[in-house]
């Protein structure tokens, strides 16, 4: 029976995302667990075009974009020390973390 923990990290700022990834990887490596990653996932770019003027001048527009950066970490066959180390990691405020537990039978 092979268990896996998949950790997906999302952020608007790639620097804070890389810092959070380094903290998680170092915490897991201290428990001597096997970790794969960080795997950079494709970033998503959302673009918005809005009128500069509320009334006339349709051709005068402004464009904005939001870039969402993502990383994936996979921990193979985790032990309780890994879960304890992950719960103690303090991450930046702008990083969203999703943890999935996969059990292979």
From Swiss-Prot:
This is Small ribosomal subunit protein uS10. One of its GO terms (molecular function) is structural constituent of ribosome. Involved in the binding of tRNA to the ribosomes. Coiled coil: none annotated. Part of the 30S ribosomal subunit. The keyword Cytoplasm does not apply. It comes from Rickettsia felis (strain ATCC VR-1525 / URRWXCal2) (Rickettsia azadi). It holds the Pfam family Ribosomal_S10. One of its GO terms (biological process) is translation. SUPFAM superfamilies: Ribosomal protein S10. SMART domains: Ribosomal_S10. Disulfide bonds: none annotated. The keyword Nucleus does not apply. The gene is rpsJ. Keywords: Ribonucleoprotein, Ribosomal protein. GO terms for cellular component: ribonucleoprotein complex; ribosome.
